[in-house]
Amino acid sequence: MSEAPAPVVTFKKGPSRRPAQSRQRRRSPSPLDPVAEASASASGSNVVRPERKSLANPLVQGTKRRRTNANNEEEEDGVGGGLDEFDYAAEGGLTRKGDELATRANDWDLEDVDGQGQRDKKVRLDEDGEIVTDDGLYRGASAYLPTINKTRETLDKKMKSGPIKATSHVRTITLMDYQPDVCKDYKETGFCGYGDSCKFLHDRGDYLAGWQLDKLPEEGVREVEEEDEEEEVPFACLICRQPFTQPVVTKCGHYFCMGCAAKRFQKSPKCYACGAPTQGIFNIADKVIAKIEARNKARREAREERAEQTGGGGIEIGGGSDEEGSDEE
């Protein structure tokens, strides 16, 4: 016998059941359909919403009121103007000329005025300028009064403390006078350990600032002595920064005074300029001595020339006393 096929089970989805009293949303009528709007107004009642009262709050700003007013005016006039336009302009009384701000001033240190008032309360003077005695109450160490009577201006200057009051003028004129970067060692001694790699200027001339040039007289400018630039020989000791006294030279070629070199050798056997070992050998500096003698000779000759010029055309005082005495006799 042949077996019968098994029955196929089929599943069928049943209809969805909805409660009979379910609330359905009414279709909103189109604004272009006046018939539907009329039927809706006749069949049902409209929702009335309460109007919100606008409170005057300065922190809340908007353009709704201006837009509403503009639309109302547009409907009345028939011309669209949009939102109101405002023109902002500064007050005419604030305009000033350029020259008026040149001497503009302001009180920057207002705290100083209060401090002055507190000092006036502490130190009180009568009509004669005498300090008014205290009433006997103890008010702390800060309330002590000076025992020596002084004037009001002196008391104000002595008792004032703190930073200096800033200028009250807004516009100031400042002059900046910069000092040139001149090598101090080369200017004072004629020698610099850095040599050509020194970042400062190697010049022995005198540089004056602007305020120093203003103090110089117009006449009688000192003559600048010409120096021999071919031979770089120092003119002052590197240790004492004074003109040489008994100049000596080391093996490394640096010049010092005899006394300065001896004191330096007692502390350290190395050279003061370059740090090389000197081994206690100091030779006589013939070049420096010759340069000093040439300079002294030039000064003597210049002094003699000046004496001859002043002596030849000068006025002799009491030169004719002998002749007058002989004539009287």
From Swiss-Prot:
GO BP: any one term:
mRNA processing
| Major site of localization recorded for this protein | nucleus
Q: Where is this region: Disordered?
A: 1-86, 298-329
Q: Where is the composition biased (Basic and acidic residues)?
A: 298-308
Q: Which InterPro entries match?
A: CWC24-like (IPR039971), Znf_CCCH (IPR000571), Znf_CCCH_sf (IPR036855), Znf_RING (IPR001841), Znf_RING/FYVE/PHD (IPR013083), Znf_RING_CS (IPR017907)
Q: Where in the sequence does UniProt note compositional bias of the Gly residues kind?
A: 310-320
Where in the chain are the RING-type zinc fingers? 237-275
Q: Where is the composition biased (Acidic residues)?
A: 72-86
Q: In its UniProt entry, what is this protein called? A: Pre-mRNA-splicing factor CWC24
Name the encoding gene, please: CWC24
